[in-house]
Protein backbone atom coordinates (compact mmCIF):
# COMPACT_ATOMS: atom_id res chain seq x y z
CA UNK A 1 0.00 0.00 0.00
CA UNK A 2 2.86 2.37 0.75
CA UNK A 3 4.23 1.89 -2.76
CA UNK A 4 0.82 2.60 -4.31
CA UNK A 5 0.60 5.63 -2.03
CA UNK A 6 3.98 6.85 -3.24
CA UNK A 7 2.94 6.43 -6.84
CA UNK A 8 -0.09 8.66 -6.52
CA UNK A 9 2.16 11.60 -5.88
CA UNK A 10 3.56 11.38 -9.40
CA UNK A 11 2.59 14.73 -10.60
CA UNK A 12 1.08 16.74 -13.33
CA UNK A 13 0.65 20.49 -14.27
CA UNK A 14 2.08 23.84 -16.14
CA UNK A 15 0.90 27.42 -15.64
CA UNK A 16 -0.97 30.03 -17.59
CA UNK A 17 -0.83 32.86 -15.02
CA UNK A 18 2.38 33.52 -13.10
CA UNK A 19 0.94 31.63 -10.13
CA UNK A 20 -2.03 29.32 -10.34
CA UNK A 21 -3.73 26.71 -8.20
CA UNK A 22 -3.56 23.35 -9.95
CA UNK A 23 -5.70 20.22 -9.61
CA UNK A 24 -4.33 17.05 -11.18
CA UNK A 25 -6.55 13.99 -11.48
CA UNK A 26 -4.81 10.71 -12.14
CA UNK A 27 -5.00 6.93 -12.10
CA UNK A 28 -2.27 4.87 -10.48
CA UNK A 29 -1.53 1.19 -10.91
CA UNK A 30 1.29 -1.22 -10.34
CA UNK A 31 2.47 -4.75 -9.81
CA UNK A 32 4.86 -6.45 -7.43
CA UNK A 33 5.06 -6.72 -3.62
CA UNK A 34 1.33 -6.78 -3.07
CA UNK A 35 0.44 -4.04 -5.55
CA UNK A 36 -2.53 -4.90 -7.75
CA UNK A 37 -5.26 -3.06 -9.60
CA UNK A 38 -5.70 0.67 -10.08
CA UNK A 39 -6.42 3.53 -7.70
CA UNK A 40 -7.89 6.91 -8.54
CA UNK A 41 -6.51 10.04 -6.97
CA UNK A 42 -5.89 13.74 -7.18
CA UNK A 43 -2.99 16.07 -6.54
CA UNK A 44 -3.55 19.71 -5.56
CA UNK A 45 -0.82 22.36 -5.74
CA UNK A 46 -1.03 25.85 -4.28
CA UNK A 47 2.28 27.69 -4.14
CA UNK A 48 4.68 25.66 -1.99
CA UNK A 49 1.95 23.38 -0.68
CA UNK A 50 0.73 20.14 -2.18
CA UNK A 51 -1.97 17.66 -1.23
CA UNK A 52 -2.19 14.12 -2.59
CA UNK A 53 -5.36 12.04 -2.21
CA UNK A 54 -5.47 8.34 -3.09
CA UNK A 55 -8.78 6.47 -3.01
CA UNK A 56 -8.44 2.83 -1.95
CA UNK A 57 -11.71 1.03 -1.47
CA UNK A 58 -13.91 3.04 0.88
CA UNK A 59 -10.99 5.01 2.31
CA UNK A 60 -9.13 8.09 1.08
CA UNK A 61 -5.46 8.37 2.07
CA UNK A 62 -4.12 11.92 2.20
CA UNK A 63 -0.64 13.40 2.37
CA UNK A 64 -0.09 17.15 2.71
CA UNK A 65 3.30 18.69 1.96
CA UNK A 66 3.84 22.18 3.40
CA UNK A 67 7.32 23.07 2.19
CA UNK A 68 7.58 26.52 3.77
CA UNK A 69 6.47 25.26 7.19
CA UNK A 70 8.58 22.09 6.75
CA UNK A 71 5.63 19.91 7.78
CA UNK A 72 4.19 16.73 6.28
CA UNK A 73 0.74 15.52 7.37
CA UNK A 74 -0.53 11.99 6.73
CA UNK A 75 -4.08 10.87 7.50
CA UNK A 76 -7.07 9.00 6.10
CA UNK A 77 -10.80 9.58 5.90
CA UNK A 78 -11.67 6.97 8.56
CA UNK A 79 -9.31 7.74 11.43
CA UNK A 80 -9.79 11.21 12.89
CA UNK A 81 -6.13 11.90 13.54
CA UNK A 82 -3.08 12.89 11.52
CA UNK A 83 0.61 12.07 11.79
CA UNK A 84 2.83 15.18 11.63
CA UNK A 85 6.47 15.07 10.53
CA UNK A 86 9.05 17.83 10.93
CA UNK A 87 10.73 17.48 7.55
CA UNK A 88 13.70 19.71 8.36
CA UNK A 89 14.76 17.31 11.10
CA UNK A 90 13.73 14.17 9.24
CA UNK A 91 15.47 15.23 6.02
CA UNK A 92 18.70 15.95 7.86
CA UNK A 93 18.67 12.51 9.51
CA UNK A 94 17.83 10.74 6.25
CA UNK A 95 20.64 12.47 4.38
CA UNK A 96 23.19 10.97 6.77
CA UNK A 97 22.44 7.50 5.40
CA UNK A 98 22.42 8.36 1.68
CA UNK A 99 25.56 8.75 -0.42
CA UNK A 100 24.61 11.64 -2.71
CA UNK A 101 28.11 11.73 -4.22
CA UNK A 102 27.44 8.40 -5.89
CA UNK A 103 23.99 9.32 -7.17
CA UNK A 104 23.29 8.85 -10.86
CA UNK A 105 20.37 10.54 -12.58
CA UNK A 106 19.37 11.09 -16.18
CA UNK A 107 16.18 11.95 -18.04
CA UNK A 108 16.85 11.91 -21.78
CA UNK A 109 14.48 12.42 -24.74
CA UNK A 110 13.92 9.23 -26.75
CA UNK A 111 12.39 10.88 -29.81
CA UNK A 112 8.96 9.28 -29.38
CA UNK A 113 5.58 11.00 -28.99
CA UNK A 114 2.06 9.84 -28.19
CA UNK A 115 -1.37 11.26 -27.38
CA UNK A 116 -2.47 11.24 -23.75
CA UNK A 117 -5.69 12.92 -22.60
CA UNK A 118 -5.90 14.86 -25.90
CA UNK A 119 -2.34 16.21 -25.50
CA UNK A 120 0.81 15.40 -27.43
CA UNK A 121 3.38 14.01 -25.00
CA UNK A 122 7.11 13.68 -25.67
CA UNK A 123 8.88 10.54 -24.52
CA UNK A 124 11.86 10.48 -22.15
CA UNK A 125 13.90 7.62 -20.73
CA UNK A 126 14.58 8.05 -17.03
CA UNK A 127 17.10 6.32 -14.77
CA UNK A 128 18.00 7.29 -11.21
CA UNK A 129 20.27 5.27 -8.90
CA UNK A 130 20.91 6.12 -5.25
CA UNK A 131 23.03 4.31 -2.65
CA UNK A 132 22.42 4.29 1.09
CA UNK A 133 23.87 2.63 4.17
CA UNK A 134 21.81 -0.01 5.93
CA UNK A 135 21.54 0.42 9.66
CA UNK A 136 24.22 3.09 9.51
CA UNK A 137 26.83 0.52 8.44
CA UNK A 138 29.04 1.43 5.47
CA UNK A 139 29.78 -2.29 5.04
CA UNK A 140 26.17 -3.00 4.13
CA UNK A 141 24.82 -0.81 1.37
CA UNK A 142 21.54 -0.70 -0.51
CA UNK A 143 21.13 0.69 -4.02
CA UNK A 144 17.73 1.75 -5.34
CA UNK A 145 17.37 2.12 -9.10
CA UNK A 146 14.33 3.74 -10.70
CA UNK A 147 13.97 3.49 -14.47
CA UNK A 148 11.37 3.66 -17.19
CA UNK A 149 9.68 5.85 -19.78
CA UNK A 150 8.11 9.20 -18.95
CA UNK A 151 5.70 11.02 -21.28
CA UNK A 152 5.81 14.78 -20.73
CA UNK A 153 3.39 17.40 -22.06
CA UNK A 154 5.32 20.63 -22.37
CA UNK A 155 3.55 23.96 -21.79
CA UNK A 156 0.50 22.20 -20.36
CA UNK A 157 -1.66 24.25 -17.97
CA UNK A 158 -0.15 24.06 -14.48
CA UNK A 159 3.43 23.18 -15.49
CA UNK A 160 5.18 26.20 -14.03
CA UNK A 161 3.48 25.69 -10.67
CA UNK A 162 4.24 21.98 -10.73
CA UNK A 163 7.92 22.66 -11.40
CA UNK A 164 8.11 25.48 -8.85
CA UNK A 165 6.76 23.29 -6.06
CA UNK A 166 9.05 20.34 -6.69
CA UNK A 167 12.16 22.47 -7.11
CA UNK A 168 11.46 24.26 -3.82
CA UNK A 169 10.81 20.97 -2.02
CA UNK A 170 13.89 19.15 -3.31
CA UNK A 171 16.12 22.13 -2.49
CA UNK A 172 15.04 21.75 1.15
CA UNK A 173 15.77 18.03 1.17
CA UNK A 174 12.19 16.80 0.98
CA UNK A 175 11.04 13.32 0.05
CA UNK A 176 7.63 12.47 -1.39
CA UNK A 177 6.80 9.19 0.31
CA UNK A 178 5.74 8.05 3.76
CA UNK A 179 8.65 8.80 6.15
CA UNK A 180 8.13 5.45 7.86
CA UNK A 181 8.91 3.63 4.63
CA UNK A 182 11.74 6.05 3.85
CA UNK A 183 13.51 5.07 7.06
CA UNK A 184 13.69 1.48 5.84
CA UNK A 185 14.58 2.40 2.25
CA UNK A 186 16.24 5.84 2.29
CA UNK A 187 17.93 5.37 -1.07
CA UNK A 188 14.62 4.72 -2.79
CA UNK A 189 13.03 7.79 -1.18
CA UNK A 190 15.91 10.04 -2.25
CA UNK A 191 15.94 8.51 -5.74
CA UNK A 192 12.25 9.32 -6.11
CA UNK A 193 12.89 12.92 -5.03
CA UNK A 194 15.71 13.23 -7.57
CA UNK A 195 13.38 11.89 -10.26
CA UNK A 196 10.85 14.65 -9.54
CA UNK A 197 13.63 17.23 -9.68
CA UNK A 198 14.79 15.98 -13.07
CA UNK A 199 11.24 16.07 -14.44
CA UNK A 200 10.62 19.58 -13.08
CA UNK A 201 13.73 20.89 -14.82
CA UNK A 202 12.38 19.78 -18.21
CA UNK A 203 9.51 22.25 -17.88
CA UNK A 204 6.40 20.17 -18.51
CA UNK A 205 3.98 17.77 -16.87
CA UNK A 206 4.50 13.99 -16.82
CA UNK A 207 1.16 12.76 -18.15
CA UNK A 208 2.30 9.16 -17.95
CA UNK A 209 5.09 7.69 -15.85
CA UNK A 210 6.08 4.03 -15.80
CA UNK A 211 8.66 3.44 -13.08
CA UNK A 212 10.39 0.14 -12.41
CA UNK A 213 12.04 -0.07 -8.99
CA UNK A 214 14.94 -2.44 -8.45
CA UNK A 215 16.84 -2.97 -5.23
CA UNK A 216 20.38 -4.26 -4.83
CA UNK A 217 23.00 -4.27 -2.14
CA UNK A 218 26.02 -5.73 -0.45
CA UNK A 219 26.45 -7.84 2.63
CA UNK A 220 24.10 -10.52 4.00
CA UNK A 221 20.97 -8.62 2.91
CA UNK A 222 21.90 -8.60 -0.80
CA UNK A 223 19.75 -11.61 -1.70
CA UNK A 224 16.70 -10.28 0.12
CA UNK A 225 17.03 -6.87 -1.53
CA UNK A 226 17.22 -8.44 -4.97
CA UNK A 227 13.91 -10.23 -4.33
CA UNK A 228 12.33 -6.91 -3.37
CA UNK A 229 12.93 -5.55 -6.88
CA UNK A 230 10.88 -5.68 -10.03
CA UNK A 231 8.16 -3.44 -8.68
CA UNK A 232 6.46 -1.38 -11.38
CA UNK A 233 4.30 1.70 -10.77
CA UNK A 234 2.29 3.50 -13.46
CA UNK A 235 0.66 6.92 -13.13
CA UNK A 236 -1.51 8.46 -15.84
CA UNK A 237 -2.96 11.97 -15.80
CA UNK A 238 -6.65 12.02 -16.67
CA UNK A 239 -7.28 15.76 -16.36
CA UNK A 240 -5.66 19.02 -15.23
CA UNK A 241 -7.74 21.90 -13.86
CA UNK A 242 -6.67 25.47 -13.11
CA UNK A 243 -9.11 26.62 -10.44
CA UNK A 244 -8.71 28.42 -7.07
CA UNK A 245 -8.16 26.09 -4.11
CA UNK A 246 -9.13 26.89 -0.51
CA UNK A 247 -6.33 27.26 2.04
CA UNK A 248 -7.93 24.75 4.42
CA UNK A 249 -7.49 22.02 1.81
CA UNK A 250 -3.81 22.03 2.78
CA UNK A 251 -4.24 21.28 6.48
CA UNK A 252 -5.76 18.37 8.44
CA UNK A 253 -9.51 18.78 9.03
CA UNK A 254 -10.57 20.70 12.12
CA UNK A 255 -10.87 18.47 15.15
CA UNK A 256 -8.29 15.91 14.03
CA UNK A 257 -5.81 14.81 16.69
CA UNK A 258 -2.23 15.63 15.63
CA UNK A 259 0.43 13.02 16.41
CA UNK A 260 4.00 14.35 16.29
CA UNK A 261 6.32 11.80 14.68
CA UNK A 262 10.11 11.42 14.51
Report each predicted region and the residues it spans.
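Bacterial N-terminal signal peptides that target proteins for export
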Residues: 1-8
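Sec/Tat signal peptide C-region and signal peptidase I cleavage site
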Residues: 14-20
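Extended soluble regions of mature proteins
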Residues: 20-262
